[in-house]
Swiss-Prot record:
Membrane-spanning residues: 6-26, 114-134
The entry's keywords: ATP-binding, Cell membrane, Hydrolase, Membrane, Metal-binding, Metalloprotease, Nucleotide-binding, Protease, Transmembrane, Transmembrane helix, Zinc
Cofactor dependence: Zn(2+)
Active-site residue list: 428
NCBIfam families the UniProt entry points to: FtsH_fam
EC identifiers of the protein: 3.4.24.-
Gene Ontology CC annotations of this record: plasma membrane
Species in which this protein is naturally found: Corynebacterium glutamicum (strain ATCC 13032 / DSM 20300 / JCM 1318 / BCRC 11384 / CCUG 27702 / LMG 3730 / NBRC 12168 / NCIMB 10025 / NRRL B-2784 / 534)
Protein name stated in the entry: ATP-dependent zinc metalloprotease FtsH
Length: 853
């Protein structure tokens, strides 16, 4: 404040000085004199036409008042003239004036005033000093020309945003963020328990899982100012700009508190300190230090919540992750089976689907995909349909779109010789048959020899449920699966090819992980080896030396080689035993180019899968399984044996939903229900996502016409299930048009068409939920908005289609949410033509042949 006052006073003084200088400069007494040449003035003196004369010695000029007017430069009636003369001619001019017949003359010897002399010296100094102070002040604040100012964008109500209803497949993350919204809306409930709002929230997870979407949903739901900025916006070429932008950002936030700041890709500025190689000054460290101080330093940060997103939490500085800065760290992982179904249903809104399109089957085939991948699959399917002039998205379009996302587009123009095509058919057949003959690996869902992306073919497995834990036999079965292609080449042609390079790479990763990470090798033991000292540019040490001796490294290499050799032997023996099946499979592949599960079941109907034998010699000698003792049964297994309904596990997610619903009803009864932000245009609420408030709820016995009450709000049934007292009719608030704070009741009466008006608030009406002709219930993802008279869609060629009808999908006994997710070995695609994995692939251990390793 003092600096601002000094600057104001200095500016006023400078303006006054400038005005005085200009006044003294332009207030001259020679305005009425016409300036003429010196010769004209001398001629008037010689002619005696001068009445008065004045010599200004300092300015070296002479002013003459004439007796008779003259004409100067076509100007008539000039009576006063002024002329300049050189300094050395001053005596001659004086003699001329003295000799002329003038009435009077005078000599004016002027001296510069003290004020003018001081102005000529002080004014430039004041201007220079003022400019320096201006630039220095701008450097401390926003920087020169705004270089150091914050680039954060504040979202306003007019900007299109998302809501929690637009987020699917991340229910736990939504619930964690919903708590922040509740705290901002109703802090008294939390403050009564002494709770404080989290000061920082870090969203981390793989790319494409919806971290930024969650932040946009918070912006649409929070109801407070929301600032968004990228981590790279803090990094500039000028020293100190990053720290200045951090200060300016938090200054704006504090002025508008309570508010939320979202920093996307915070790893650009939040990497661990001490990672410089040359020992010099690191501008990023200065920015990070300022960020740490602003998040939890000596100053107050009341009412400012910092959200951040990154897919590299391992490189962040430990001081940034401690409680008090990021109190809550929320993982946003790839969705499970149920989450994929919800995401596909969200992105299926507005897309017409053919009757054979099955969203649930697509969700099972896309294990390991992120939400962005799933959205891309449906978009590719729509583009394929538009390319062929179709009006509905078919199952073939979904399958082709999945293959395009996984392995790339088809290379239809590639010329392949007959011999290479035959080698590819046997190579992929070796993978398929090796997996089919083992119990410890999923059956192959699809095998093809069509060139796609950088692969010449691939075999894909599809799991029934999401798995997160693998035993030794299951991992070894994947090694056998990977070695099947090379074994087929050796068995049939007698020589290997380069097509198995990606298979060898994937198998080596699995085998090395079994030995060095999972402790499955008796020779090495249960010790984690192979941990490098770290990346020298990540702040976690440098050098890259292994943390074990050369003798241990040799033992590890020996064990890895043993696993690969044994898997090679097992796959070779399987193919040699079922050589006839391999020939029939290769023949069918050469004919149809693509085979699916029904075709493979018909070819391999007489193959009995075997269990993997003992992997390591005498592996069960030291720690054998106790005989005649079985593990205990889970409550679900016991309930199924008794023919009872499986018990429902306690869920904090469901309990918090029930609490929010109960709180919503209380506020609704009091007429204090806050207005919920509308969902973004064109996006319907996701299944399983947090439901918004759309006015007074319908009666408890109301249901969609024809649905027998199936579509009642799930939140209405949860309180009693989660141990909360159910609301009795006597406790229910009276239903009235004004019970929600003056808003109209959308559930008042059905419309003339029979469709309840309240369903419009949820994104779809009765006509979308029910088939009016049959009364059958539709899945939202499989509903076409318009029913075309002739359905045209993308279809695969006849020779690529299955000769056998698809069998109904087997429902799993356990719900997909019962399984836990634990990262295992990332698998590689099984391709038969390239030594490199497919571009844009995913780490997916449970879907080994799905070309996403």
């Amino acid at each position: 404040m003092k600096n601002k006052k000094y600057l104001q006073f200095g500016g006023i003084a400078a303006v006054i000085l400038i005005v005085l200088f200009l006044v003294s400069l332009f207030s001259s007494d020679t305005r009425n004199f016409q300036e003429v040449d010196t010769s004209v003035a001398m001629a008037q003196l010689d002619a005696g036409n001068v009445a008065e004369a004045q010599i200004d010695d300092r300015e070296q000029r002479v002013r003459l008042t004439l007796r008779e007017p003259i004409t100067v430069d076509e100007r008539e009636g000039v009576e006063e003239i002024l002329a300049q003369y050189p300094a050395r001619t001053a005596p001659a001019i004086f003699e001329k004036v003295e000799a002329s017949n003038t009435d009077s003359y005078t000599t004016n010897v002027t001296q510069e005033s003290f004020l003018m002399s001081m102005l000529s010296f002080i004014l430039p100094m004041v201007i220079i000093f003022g400019l320096l102070m201006f630039f220095l002040t701008r450097m401390q604040g926003g920087g020169m020309f705004g270089i150091g100012g914050s680039k954060a964008k504040q979202l306003t109500k007019d900007m299109p945003t998302n809501t929690f209803a637009d987020v699917a497949g991340a229910e736990e993350a939504v619930d964690e963020l919903h708590e922040i919204k509740d705290f901002l809306e109703d802090p008294t409930r939390y403050e009564a328990l002494g709770a404080k709002i989290p000061r920082g929230v870090l969203l981390y997870g793989p790319p494409g899982t919806g971290k930024t979407l969650l932040a946009r949903a918070v912006a649409g739901e929070a109801g407070v100012p929301f600032y968004s900025i990228s981590g790279s916006d803090f990094v500039e070429m000028f020293v100190g700009v990053g720290a200045s932008r951090v200060r300016d950002l938090f200054k704006q936030a504090k002025e508008n508190s309570p508010c939320i700041i979202f920093v996307d890709e915070i790893d650009a500025v939040g990497r661990a300190r001490g990672s410089g190689m040359g020992g010099g000054h690191d501008e990023r460290e200065q920015t990070l230090n300022q960020l740490l101080v602003e998040m939890d330093g000596f100053g107050d940060r009341q009412g400012v919540i910092l959200m951040a997103a990154t897919n590299r939490p391992d490189v962040l500085d430990p001081a940034l992750l401690r409680p008090g800065r990021f109190d809550r760290q929320i993982p946003v992982t790839n969705p499970d089976l149920r989450g994929r179904e919800q995401i596909l249903e969200v992105h299926a809104k507005g897309k017409p689907f053919a009757p054979d399109a099955d969203i649930k089957a697509l969700a099972k085939r896309t294990a390991g995909m992120s939400g962005a991948d799933l959205a891309n699959v449906l978009n590719e399917a729509a583009l394929l349909t538009a390319r062929v002039g179709g009006n509905v998205i078919t199952a073939d379009a979904l399958e082709e779109a999945t293959d395009r996302v996984v392995g790339g587009p088809r290379r239809s123009g590639k010329v392949i010789s007959e011999k290479e095509k035959k080698v590819t058919a046997y190579h992929e057949g070796g993978h398929t048959l090796s997996a089919w003959a083992l119990e410890d690996i999923e059956r192959v869902y699809k095998v093809t020899i069509l060139a796609r992306g950088r692969t010449g073919g691939h075999a894909m497995t599809a799991q029934e449920d999401d798995k997160g834990m693998y035993n030794r036999n299951e991992l070894f079965a994947r090694l056998v699966f990977a070695m099947g292609g090379r074994s087929a080449e050796e068995l049939v042609f007698g020589e290997p090819t380069t097509g198995a390079s990606a298979d060898i790479e994937m198998a080596t990763k699995i085998a090395r992980s079994m030995v060095t990470e999972y402790g499955m090798s008796p020779a090495v033991g249960m010790v984690k080896y192979g941990q490098e000292q770290g990346d020298p540019f990540s702040g976690r040490g440098g050098g890259g030396n292994l943390d074990h001796s050369q003798e241990v490294a040799a033992t590890i290499d020996t064990e890895v080689q043993f696993l690969l050799d044994k898997a090679h032997e097992v796959s070779y023996s399987i193919l040699a035993e079922y050589r006839d099946h391999l020939d029939r499979l290769a023949e069918k592949l050469l004919e149809k180019e693509t085979l699916r599960r029904p075709d493979l079941e018909a070819l391999f109907d007489d193959i009995v899968p075997r269990k993997v034998a003992e992997v390591f010699p005498d592996e069960s000698t030291r720690f054998p399984r106790q005989e005649n003792r079985e593990p205990v049964k889970t409550p679900v297994e016991l309930a199924l044996e008794r023919g009872e309904e499986p018990p429902k596990k306690f869920s904090i997610l469901e309990a918090s939903r029930a609490t929010r619903e109960r709180r919503r009803k209380e506020l609704e009864a009091q007429g204090k229900l806050p207005v919920q932000p509308a969902s973004s245009a064109g996006v319907a609420p996701a299944a399983g996502a947090a439901a918004g408030s759309y006015g007074t709820p319908p009666p408890a016995d109301w249901s969609v016409p024809g649905s027998a009450g199936k579509h009642r709000s799930r939140a209405e049934e949860q309180p009693a299930e989660q141990g909360f007292p159910a609301q009795t009719p006597a406790q229910a608030p009276e239903q009235s048009p004004d019970s929600s704070g003056g808003r109209p009741n959308p559930y008042a009466t059905p419309t003339a068409s029979g469709e309840h008006p309240g369903m419009k608030a949820y994104g779809f009406g009765d006509s979308e939920l029910m088939d009016q002709s049959t009364g059958a219930e539709h899945t939202p993802g499989n509903v076409s908005q318009e029913s075309p008279t002739e359905m045209i869609g993308f279809r695969l060629p006849d020779h690529e289609r299955s000769d056998y009808p698809e069998k109904a999908q087997k429902e799993s006994v356990l719900d997909a949410s019962e399984t836990t997710e634990m990262p295992v070995v990332p698998d590689q695609p099984i391709d038969g033509d390239s030594g490199k994995s497919a571009e844009g692939t995913q780490e997916n251990p449970e879907n080994e042949g799905d070309n996403r390793g």
